[in-house]
Design a protein with these regions (language model features):
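Conserved N-terminal catalytic core of the sugar/cofactor nucleotidyltransferase
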Residues: 1-9, 16-126, 133, 149, ...
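Left-handed beta-helix
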Residues: 3-4, 207-414, 419-438, 445, ...
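Alpha-helical scaffold segments in soluble metabolic enzymes
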Residues: 29, 42, 46, 71, ...
Length: 481
C-alpha cells in the first residue's frame, strides 16, 4: 500500500485575543479573517494541487470541540474538503491528546500525519507545499518533523527552535526548543541565523507518534485509547468518551514529546526541522492579522464599510455599520453588531484582559455573537427589551428545528421568504410568505423548511423569561438533548 499524507486539522482553539470577532461559541478558526474563506477552510484546502513525492488523502481528519461540530462539518463541506471523520473532544486537553486521538483513528496503511492547527494564515501556498514535500519524505522514513518559520523580524510572541547541522531535503537537526524570548534576546536569535519560529506544524507516521507518546506520556496514550474504545461513532462524528477523556492529562505536542526527542538517542526517533518561508502567521492577536493583511499606501488594512482620513498603520474592520477614523495612527478598530473594540496596535495582546472581565461580569458578548449558527441554519437577535425579544431566523432547505416546548414564552412567527411547515400541538400546516402564526406558551411545536430555498422569518418572543435554556426537546434530528 502506498504511504499517504493524511492531513490532521486541530480545530480546538478559542482565540480570545481576537475578540470581538472571535467568541467562545464561534472561535477564530471559523472566521474569514484573511480572504473570503474561513481559516479552517483555508487550512483544509492548503494542499490543493500538491505534486510531491507522496499522495495526499482526499479527506482530512479533523479534531474539534463537540460544540462546533455542525458548523465545522458544514464549512468543510462548503470548501469541498469534507472530513473522513470529525473526532469530537468533550473538553479541551491541548494538542498532544488531540493528536493521539487522531493517530489512533488514522486507520490502515500507517499514513504520514500532517498536523496543522486550523487557525493559521499562509500567503504563499507553493512555498508551503514545497516544505511539506520535504518533510513528508523524512517522515515516511520514520522521522518526526516540525517546520520552522524563517524569521523576518525579532518577535516576542513566538517560541523559537535552535537548529543544528543540516540533514536531508534541506532540513536541519533540532538543537533545542526555546520559550518566547524578550525583545533583546529575540534580536540576537534573528541575527544569528540559527533560530526559527516554532510554527506548531508537524509530520510523522501515525505509528511513530504512538511510539513517542507511549515512551514519554503513557498516561495520555492510555486515556486516549480508553476514550476511543468507549466512544461512539455517529455518521461522520467520532465521539471520544467523556469520562475517559476527562481523565486525560492536558499537554502540548512540544512539551509532551518534541522537546524531549533531540536529546534522547535511545528513543530511536530522529527529529528534524524544515525551514519554511511561506507568509505564515498564527494570527494570535490583531496586530498579527495586520502584519499579513493587504494594506493601502498609508499602511492601513480595512474590511467592510470603512472611511479613513489622516489615518496610518491601522487595522479597521466593519462587520455591519460604517466606521470612520480621523487623525489616528497604529490603532485597531473592530466593529460587530453588539460590541466594538478600539485598541492601540501595540496593546492588542491585552484584549484577553477585557475578555476576562466580560466573563466575570457574565456578559453574553464573550460567548456568542448576535448571529448564532445552529445545525439547521442561524438566527440573529435583532432587538430585545423587557418581556420581549425579536429574532431573524433562517432555516436551510430540508432542515428542521427540534420538536420543543417553552415554559415561559409564547412566539409569533412571520414568514418573509420561503414556506414553513409548522407543527403546533396536534396541527401540522404550511405558512407562506407574508403569512404568520402564533405558538402559545407551553405548546409543543416544530418549525421545518420543506422547500428548496432558505426559509426566512421574523420571530417575536414574549414572556417572563426569554433565555435559550427555556426549552424542552421531545425530538431532535441532530441528537441534542
Amino acid at each position: 500500500m502506498t504511504t499517504q499524507i493524511l492531513p490532521v486539522i486541530l480545530s480546538g482553539g478559542s482565540g480570545t485575543r481576537l475578540w470581538p470577532l472571535s467568541r467562545e461559541q464561534h472561535p477564530k478558526q471559523l472566521l474569514a479573517l484573511h480572504g473570503d474563506a474561513s481559516l479552517l477552510q483555508a487550512t483544509a484546502t492548503r494542499l490543493a494541487g500538491f505534486t510531491g513525492a507522496l499522495e495526499v488523502a482526499a479527506q482530512p481528519l479533523v479534531v474539534c470541540n463537540e460544540e462546533y461540530r455542525f458548523i465545522t462539518a458544514e464549512q468543510l463541506r462548503a470548501a469541498g474538503r469534507p472530513a473522513s471523520a470529525l473526532i469530537l473532544e468533550p473538553m479541551g486537553r491541548n494538542t498532544a491528546p488531540a493528536l493521539t486521538l487522531a493517530a489512533l483513528a488514522a486507520g490502515e496503511g500507517d499514513p504520514v500525519l500532517l498536523v496543522m492547527p486550523a487557525d493559521h494564515v499562509v500567503t504563499d501556498r507553493a512555498a508551503f507545499q514545497q516544505a511539506i514535500d520535504a518533510g513528508a519524505q523524512l517522515a515516511r522514513d520514520g522521522a518526526v518533523v516540525t517546520f520552522g518559520i524563517v524569521p523576518d523580524r525579532p518577535e516576542t510572541g513566538y517560541g523559537y527552535i535552535q537548529t543544528g547541522e543540516g540533514t536531508a531535503h534541506g532540513a536541519r537537526r533540532i538543537a533545542r526548543f526555546v520559550e518566547k524570548p524578550d525583545l533583546e534576546t529575540a534580536g540576537r536569535y534573528v541575527s544569528s541565523g540559527e533560530y526559527l519560529w516554532n510554527s506548531g506544524l508537524f509530520m510523522m507516521k501515525a505509528s511513530v507518534w504512538l511510539k513517542a507518546i507511549e515512551r514519554y506520556r503513557p498516561d495520555i496514550l492510555a486515556a486516549c485509547r480508553n476514550a476511543i474504545a468507549n466512544g461512539a461513532r455517529d455518521a461522520d462524528f467520532m465521539r471520544a468518551d467523556k469520562a475517559a477523556f476527562a481523565a486525560c492529562p492536558s499537554d502540548s505536542i512540544d512539551y509532551a514529546v518534541m522537546e524531549k526527542l533531540p536529546s534522547d538517542a535511545a528513543a530511536g526517533i530522529e527529529a528534524h526541522v524544515v525551514p519554511m518561508s511561506c507568509g505564515w502567521s498564527d494570527v494570535g492577536a490583531w496586530d498579527a492579522l495586520w502584519q499579513v493583511a493587504d494594506k493601502d499606501a498609508a499602511g492601513n488594512a480595512t474590511r467592510g464599510d470603512v472611511m479613513l482620513h489622516e489615518t496610518r498603520g491601522s487595522l479597521v474592520l466593519a462587520d455591519g455599520r460604517m466606521v470612520a477614523c480621523i487623525g489616528v495612527d497604529d490603532v485597531v478598530v473592530v466593529e460587530t453588531p453588539d460590541a466594538v473594540l478600539v485598541a492601540s496596535k501595540a496593546h492588542t495582546q491585552e484584549v484577553k484582559q477585557i475578555v476576562g472581565r466580560l466573563k466575570q461580569a457574565g456578559r453574553s458578548e464573550v460567548t456568542n455573537h448576535r448571529k448564532v449558527y445552529r445545525p439547521w441554519g442561524w438566527y440573529d437577535s435583532i432587538d430585545a427589551g423587557p418581556r420581549f425579544q425579536v429574532k431573524r431566523i433562517v432555516v436551510n432547505p430540508g432542515a428542521s428545528l427540534s420538536l420543543q416546548m417553552h415554559h415561559h414564552r409564547a412566539e409569533h412567527w412571520i414568514v418573509v421568504t420561503g414556506t414553513a411547515r409548522v407543527t403546533r400541538g396536534d396541527e401540522v400546516f404550511l405558512v407562506s410568505e407574508n403569512q404568520s402564526t402564533y405558538i402559545p406558551l407551553g405548546t409543543k411545536h416544530r418549525l421545518e423548511n420543506p422547500g428548496k430555498v432558505p426559509l426566512e422569518m421574523i420571530e417575536v418572543q414574549s414572556g417572563a423569561y426569554l433565555g435559550e435554556d427555556d426549552i424542552v426537546r421531545f425530538q431532535d434530528t441532530y441528537g441534542r438533548g
